[in-house]
């Protein structure tokens, strides 16, 4: 037991002596030479000499000398700081050696961090909301889907193919109502594929908002002009009725034959003649004005008949050829409705007059 302890102490002493001897040798200024010799022995290319390096031991000695110089400032006024001594190498070889063998500088994390703006930009391209990147922007995704579908629809139209999906989207647009054709403004031009409509890529959210506002404006114009014509029709009918009621005695409606025979004495047919003439002028003006403003077929597109044709056309495409005829018939039905409405007003006034008598 004691022999083993003595042996360990002896080895420790040997290592301590060897270390002290090595430090003494290095303190004589031979540390850098030995380090350069070791580096030169490991070089595979003999023609190129390795750069001269400085040992760490000599750097420590230099630092200790500089520290002692700064402390003894009263005896040596021109002291050099350790940072200046380290920052000013004595030769180009030492500078290159430090840059080659020292640890690299710590890289700033901001240089390698993910740029949020780039992620948000990619998110916008993929349909993500910039305010909340984790949630998709449904409006932009829906717009891109419709643009792709409209482009596919244009290609199929050029090839003479029928696209059921395009017909379905067209039906939804017609059910929504809005612009001159009763659609949703820009959506109709997107899916129509007409040469006058802008390409799907050029339709921006601002353009879509403009088309929606334009559809609302057309609806307002249609309702405004219908109200104006309604006021004119009512006033014209009441004025015609009041004129004949004042100028013609016994101006009334009756089931008795002797009352109807009064037309031989009094020109009772003049009322219907004037009424019919006024109705012709009003209907003609209504048709010309609404056609000029592009509002004549706007309300017809909201009819359930056209919506039913659009729905059935997805299964029977041949029904689309009859859609313009049905739209024209509905337009003339509106004109006929004006005459029937005014005639109903006349019947009501005659009924009130007969009830009062």
From Swiss-Prot:
The record's annotation in Pfam families points to: GET2
Q: Where is the composition biased (Polar residues)?
A: 88-98
Query: What is this protein's record name?
Result: Golgi to ER traffic protein 2
- Highest taxon of the lineage: Eukaryota
Chain's role = Required for the post-translational delivery of tail-anchored (TA) proteins to the endoplasmic reticulum. Together with GET1, acts as a membrane receptor for soluble GET3, which recognizes and selectively binds the transmembrane domain of TA proteins in the cytosol. The GET complex cooperates with the HDEL receptor ERD2 to mediate the ATP-dependent retrieval of resident ER proteins that contain a C-terminal H-D-E-L retention signal from the Golgi to the ER.
Q: Where is this region: Disordered?
A: 65-99
Provenance organism: Lodderomyces elongisporus (strain ATCC 11503 / CBS 2605 / JCM 1781 / NBRC 1676 / NRRL YB-4239) (Yeast)
Keywords per UniProt = Endoplasmic reticulum, ER-Golgi transport, Golgi apparatus, Membrane, Transmembrane, Transmembrane helix, Transport
Q: Where is the composition biased (Low complexity)?
A: 65-81
Residue ranges, Cytoplasmic compartment? 1-224, 291-334
Q: Its gene? A: GET2
- Report the sequence similarity comment from the record: Belongs to the GET2 family.
Topological domains on the Lumenal side lie at 246-270, 356-357
Query: Per UniProt, what is the membrane topology?
Result: Multi-pass membrane protein
- Predominant localisation class: endoplasmic reticulum
Q: How does it assemble?
A: Component of the Golgi to ER traffic (GET) complex, which is composed of GET1, GET2 and GET3. Within the complex, GET1 and GET2 form a heterotetramer which is stabilized by phosphatidylinositol binding and which binds to the GET3 homodimer.
Q: Tell me, which GO biological process terms does this entry list?
A: protein insertion into ER membrane; retrograde vesicle-mediated transport, Golgi to endoplasmic reticulum
Question: Any idea where this protein resides?
Answer: Endoplasmic reticulum membrane; Golgi apparatus membrane
Q: What residue ranges are annotated as transmembrane? A: 225-245, 271-290, 335-355
Give the record's GO CC terms: endoplasmic reticulum membrane; GET complex; Golgi membrane
